[in-house]
């Protein structure tokens, strides 16, 4: 049975794919990140991705596919997985234009049954994927299942501390309880970056730091590294968050 929250989010991303593609075209990172991986991956992430040439890597919730393109440019054999077929269609066209050999698979990250057990040397997921997913344990459980023994699960997510603030250009004030995991229902506009109301239904989930750690451990991976990085603030975030960590990086190793 299809997950109603994920189906709503799939429809939302299918509908918004053209708008999101326009933003990506304006920034132009997708055109260059296969030549310079640091455009798509932070130094903290690249520390764990130094020697990926020839390795099989799955990117879960690949979205704009900048990470997938960066890893492909580094010589990895990349499989890009996303719930939105429209997002993947955009990525296919871009990969062809860049001459990149990336495999694209449409799937929900909590059901990767189209992918075999112990298939990949490394699984990367992050950016802003987990807030769209209703079951973190199944999500990371599937990620671990497709990992080869001793393979790495790299989770690099938007930091949960940044999700609690009210929208204000000048003040930091808690607007959402840190422990209110949701589902949070929104009627959103076509433009993903801006918070105007619209006709597209979407659901988000606010996972805590402990939720991320617990889900990785439950997946059968050993947690071998944890790190927070970034301290800037972006206009789309709607609050002055400079000085707070931007991202949470967790590294798991699939146990034998």
Give residue ranges: language-model regions.
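N-terminal, positively charged/glycine-rich alpha-helical extensions of SAM-dependent methyltransferases
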Residues: 1-28
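Conserved alpha-helix/loop element of class I SAM-dependent methyltransferases that forms part
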Residues: 25-55
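Class I SAM-dependent methyltransferase SAM/SAH-binding core
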Residues: 56-111
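A short acidic, Gly/Pro-enriched loop at the edge of an enzyme's catalytic core
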Residues: 110-123
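A short SAM/SAH-binding and catalytic strip from SAM-dependent methyltransferases
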Residues: 121-137
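A short glycine-rich, Lys/Arg-flanked "PGG" loop and its adjoining helix->strand segment in the class I
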Residues: 137-152
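Conserved class I S-adenosyl-L-methionine
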Residues: 152-189
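Short alpha-helix
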Residues: 203-226
């Amino acid at each position: 049975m299809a997950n109603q929250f994920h189906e709503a989010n799939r429809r939302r991303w299918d509908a918004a794919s053209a708008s999101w593609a326009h933003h990506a075209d304006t920034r132009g990172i997708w055109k260059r990140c296969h030549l310079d991986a640091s455009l798509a991956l932070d130094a903290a992430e690249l520390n764990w991705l130094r020697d990926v040439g020839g390795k099989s890597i799955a990117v879960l919730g690949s979205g704009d596919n900048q990470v997938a393109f960066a890893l492909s440019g580094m010589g990895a054999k990349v499989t890009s997985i996303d719930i939105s077929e429209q997002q993947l269609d955009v990525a296919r066209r871009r990969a062809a234009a860049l001459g990149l050999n990336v495999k694209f698979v449409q799937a929900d990250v909590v059901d990767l049954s189209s992918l075999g057990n112990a298939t990949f040397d490394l699984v990367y997921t992050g950016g802003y994927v987990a807030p769209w997913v209703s079951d973190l344990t199944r999500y990371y459980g599937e990620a671990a299942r497709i990992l080869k023994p001793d393979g790495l699960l790299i989770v690099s997510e938007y930091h949960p501390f940044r999700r609690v603030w009210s929208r204000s250009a000048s003040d930091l004030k808690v607007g959402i309880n840190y422990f209110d995991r949701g589902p949070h229902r929104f009627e959103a506009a076509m433009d993903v970056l801006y918070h105007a109301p619209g006709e597209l239904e979407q659901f988000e989930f606010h996972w805590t730091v402990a939720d991320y750690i617990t889900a990785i451990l439950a997946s059968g991976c050993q947690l071998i590294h944890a790190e927070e990085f970034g301290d800037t603030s972006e206009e789309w975030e709607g609050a002055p968050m400079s000085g707070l960590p931007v991202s949470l990086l967790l590294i798991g190793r699939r146990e034998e």
